Amino acid sequence: MHIAAKVATVGIALAVLGGCSTLQSLNPFASKPVPRNPPAALAEFKPAMTVKSAWTVNIGKAGTALFNPALSGGSVFVAAADGAIARLDAATGAQVWRINAGVPLTAGVGADAGTVAVGAAGGVVLVFSADGKQRWKAQASSEILGAPAVAQGMVIVRSIDNRNVAFDADSGARRWQLQRPAPSLALRSAPGIAIDAQSAFVGMPGGRMVALALTNGGPRWEVAVGDPRGATELERIADVSGVPVMAGREVCAVAYQGRVGCVDASSGATRWAKEFSSEVGLGADDRNIYGADERGNVNAYTRDAGVSVWRNSGLSNRRLSAPVPVGRAVAVGDYQGYMHFLSREDGALLARSATDGSRVIGTPVVTGNTVIFQTQAGTVAALTAE
């Protein structure tokens, strides 16, 4: 669990607590970590599905950022902390272009057919055309941790001080902004924004999800995915995690120390909600919603009613990524760079594939039967489920 503290209105991250799985950070004289919630050992199993490596490349280390690939058409866009940004062929991994932004990056990538956007150090928004040429840059109010959302001719970012700003994708002109009070403590995660034809769905600290009108940024509705509760600021963290998922006529979201659920995308009316806690986002298909809770359990719920379909507890405390459906499986990465493939039907482990030994970060993306993901050490891998 990573937590950022904010002071006044500048939104500067003062501290990142990365020791949720050990007690070493509480004892500076300890010679080695003392496990508090040790990660589950990888069980031996007989693979029931073939997974092949389609391609791998290295973009560069992520550092503390949670970069994730962005798919658009037949291309995948990736970025690294040192400023590297690349466009790859999604089928082969061949490099179409690679540039360096010239500044450290903190968030990315957001992309559509004509626009590529990242967040840079100091709260700078950098936007490029699909051929890698810089189009414009703009200054946000504070650090950007989540990939910019790019769609409908807009680039929308949320900064750590809880300010949401929409820029014109072509000119960089500011179209609108909305700011909400920022709590004193928030997850240092990669907060996401999803966009449809009418609205931007924004996950907020404090457990709120807001639908903003694309025309002017006005709130169309607001719902509580989590409710801050407890005696301490740490106990009261209830942030929406990851990118809200658009699934049919619903939009679904999950919160840390909160709930998982789906609401009507047009009205915000709750379809269903369950107690849940997650630091990462969700995956969805035409039947189910998939989520990995903070203890490493992978859960499937029916999309229409939230009925529990299955639960896999075999990956407990392995710091999982958001699970995503691919082929007949649900793919979920872990802190050692493994990608696990679970059955969509019952959650049984079907296959496992190793990468570079570092954590799978961000949210994997899927094209056809191939899942593409990025690790903290910089590997971008494409695995095909057969």
Please state what every model-predicted region is.
Residues 23-26, 30-37, 47-70, 97-112, ...:
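Extracytoplasmic beta-rich repeat domains
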